[in-house]
């Protein structure tokens, strides 16, 4: 982990340097900026890879009911040379880290997951005895009709561990707007996932 101090803004960066080599040097990786006024309540959870940062928000410091874990993730595209070369499965890594926190952990996962889920709403697994909450009563909107390999991995992740997809389910984005705009089209590949009952 590399830490960069941005004192002029009162921010500290938690950065993971990329492991991908390009022209003999590293590139990629992710960074999260934390304001100095809250750094005492934020701690970093160790991870194996270079594309996942997990921060723990201390419940006492933030006056929360439970400790909350913020996952910041980047998943290299499934067909990228890096993914092919390393046989990397980012969703297995995310699932393992969530499982290690236990079933009562409050989780918020944000990131560019390069997952296209199309109209697949199977991410919301409800047992027969489930009492409906507000999120579950809304079908998830998604303006991106395409589903790719990572889309299937993401919905499988949501069935095996608590977080559910909030894109297209919350006020402000009930239609599931596009999150990526390029010269050759638009897609929804950036996500917000949260544990059931998380107040976001």
Region spans (language model):
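A shared catalytic/ligand-binding motif for oxyanion handling
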Residues: 1-200
